[in-house]
From Swiss-Prot:
It is an enzyme of class 2 (transferase). This is DNA-directed RNA polymerase subunit omega. Belongs to the RNA polymerase subunit omega family. SMART domains: RNA_pol_Rpb6. SUPFAM superfamilies: RPB6/omega subunit-like (SSF63562). Promotes RNA polymerase assembly. Latches the N- and C-terminal regions of the beta' subunit thereby facilitating its interaction with the beta and alpha subunits. The gene is rpoZ. Its EC number is 2.7.7.6. The RNAP catalytic core consists of 2 alpha, 1 beta, 1 beta' and 1 omega subunit. When a sigma factor is associated with the core the holoenzyme is formed, which can initiate transcription. The lineage of its organism: Bacteria, Bacillati, Bacillota, Bacilli, Bacillales. It catalyses: RNA(n) + a ribonucleoside 5'-triphosphate = RNA(n+1) + diphosphate. Keywords: DNA-directed RNA polymerase, Nucleotidyltransferase, Transcription, Transferase. It comes from the Bacteria.
Amino acid sequence: MLNPPLNQLQSKINSKYLIATTAAKRARELDERPETALLSGYHSAKPVGEALEEIASGKITPVVSDEFTM
């Protein structure tokens, strides 16, 4: 079971795919630099879960570019 629930995450970020990519990027950052943690305590022991908790709390928001370049 996903914790935090998907509907709670989608109230912050509308797209499941954007949630996944945002969480993955943030999890990599947390894994490489744990001192960048934004919450005082996490329920999850893994970086992906911690990233999802940050998204659910509103601490992390994705930056989306409308520009397409090749």
